[in-house]
Amino acid sequence: MIAGGVGSVDARHQHKLPLPAGTLLVQLGGPGMRIGLGGGAASSMGVGSNAAELDFASVQRANPEMERRVQEVINACRAMGDNNPILSIHDVGAGGLSNAFPELAHDADKGADFDLSRIPVAESGMSPAEIWCNESQERYVLGIAPERLPELEALCTRERCPMAVVGTVTDAEHLKLAAPGEPPAVDIDMSVLFGKSPKLRREGATPARTELPGMDLSELNLDTLATQILQLPAVASKSFLITIADRTVGGLSVRDPMVGPWQVPVADCAVGLLDYRNHHGDALSMGERSPAAVQDSAAASRLAIAESLTNLLSAVPDDLGQTKLSANWMADAGSAGQDAALYAAVEAASRLCIELGISIPVGKDSLSMRARWKGDDGQRVKEIGRAHV
């Protein structure tokens, strides 16, 4: 299953503001734990080939209550409009604080000094690398002027949201992480982290196209064929994904997930309001053509984009240029023919979007889509290079 979402941002808050030297760097949210330390090492491996220690280290553990508290603080800051105390903000994802804080400073062409002892942790005995690199959820990093700190502290106290000032911005583009009285755990120039790394070169051979063999239809049973086709996830009803949960939360859903007088078919797209006072909103649709990718990944990529756009038509968009795509590229990278299939899918999507005048500003790659069991020489299931849009 693939899940996605859409959001909106006030035009006044869409650009990060400069971070002068002395700006406070704050961690907002819960403490760090030994979570996600498998990180990219685990996500780059096929299911079934991981070591138990790596599986445990890479697993994520969510805390919805903490996420809600953090979100309420951010919402309160956003509601201040031009008086928003947040100068710049990042969510903490892959790489943990070791990625989020340096990116925050680098975006402002600055450096930063961090006090390792100020970073909140929930487990004893964590090494500096574990504290700095763990991927615990429900955390954000932000820059705030020193004089605005009392306001942020008051908001966090009201919402019972943990926060900690863990560093300051410096003019020198240098990154330092140290605990008082201890040698620095990190002491490097920002250029080492953000310098131009060499591009990865991959070569993949395009396999020869094989024509589908002719089929003897005389022995096929129509009922059996219909049942098999209707069981295909790309064809079957998706209603079970809706009926297992609440249809709407918050009262801003305009288009009910199910349509028609008996509420049986699933709607082509989702439509939600931005607030309770106006009639502006967002529409969200999806497209995927997995069966077509078996024969032609480029065609499947174009079909997925076409499906997402035609599903969106029921919301009657004013202009196609208002549409933004998010593509999830999926493949079993490295296996025979899959690198070439993925390249063809990306190239086809790029050319089509250029012709249509739309862009794919965001997305995700899932390039270890394979599962194996009974060892490396046993059974294997793999993904075909394609795109979800």
Over which residues does each language-model region extend?
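Glycine/proline-enriched, intrinsically flexible loops and inter-domain linkers
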Residues: 1-386
